[in-house]
Amino acid sequence: MATYVIGDLQGCLTPLVQLLEQINYQPQLDKLWFAGDLINRGEESLETLRFIKSLGSNATIVLGNHDLHLLAVSHGYGKLKRGDTLAEILTASDRDDLMNWLRQQPLFHYDEQLNTVMTHAGIPPCWDLAKTQSLAKEVEKKLKSDSVDDFFATMYGNTPDTWSDELTGLDRLRAITNYLTRMRFCDENSKLDLKSKEGINTAEKGFAPWFNYPSKVPEDCHIVFGHWAALEGKTQLERIHALDTGCVWGGSLTALRLEDKQRFSTPCTLNRKNS
C-alpha cells in the first residue's frame, strides 16, 4: 500500500491518467491525496472533477482557491475571469451533484500514521497544527451550512492581512481562507503579501516565503502543499514539499510517495485556455 500526494491539476486530466499509469496505481491498495486546485484554466476541468469524485474514499482532497472560486460562482457570487474554464462545469447536467460534493471537502488533512499535513497553500508561522485544524474546521463548517451564501459574497479580498485571534465573523473566515488557499509570502508576524505571486526572489521588502520562518508545526511533521507553481517544486527544506509544478502551464504533474518521499512526474503540454 502506498499514499501519493499529487499537485495542482487545474483541469488537466490526461496528465493525471498518465501519472497514475507511471506509478502503477492500484485502487485496491493505494491512496491518492490531491493538494487542491483540481480545476480551472485547463481544458478538462469537468472531466477532472468527475474523475476525482469517482475515486470515492481512495481520494483525499483539500480545497484550493480555484475550487472555492468555482463554488462561489456556482452560488451566484464572483465572476468568471479571463482564462477560467468553468463554464462547462456550471452548465453540466450533474452540476449540483458535483458542487454539493465539492463543498463537503476539507481545507486541511492530517495523517497521524504518516505524520504529514496537507493544505493547499501551506501553514503560516503563527499557527501550530492543532490551531490550523481548528481554524480550517470553522470554514469547513460554513461551507457545509445552509448559510454559505454570505461567506461566498464576502470571500474575495486581501484583508484582513494579519491574523488575530480577535477576528470574528466573515472577516475571520476570509482571513483563514486566504492563509490556507492563497498564501505565498508573509512577514515575521505572518502578515500576508497576496500581490506577489512569482518566485522566492520576488518578495517585497520585509516578506519571505511562509516556510522560511520558524514553524510551530512539530519538526518531525512533513507539510505538503500546492498553489505555488513558480517554486518549481522546490523549497530547499527536507520536510516541506511543494507539489505544484505548473502542469497547466506546460510544466509537469508531480506525485510524492509519502512512505519514502520519492517523487514521480509526467511532462505536460500547455493545456490552458487561450484567452
Residue ranges and their predicted role:
Residues M1-F51, L55, L68:
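N-terminal active-site segment of His-dependent metallophosphoesterases
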Residues L46-T48, S54-G169:
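Active-site neighborhood of divalent metal-dependent phosphoester bond hydrolases
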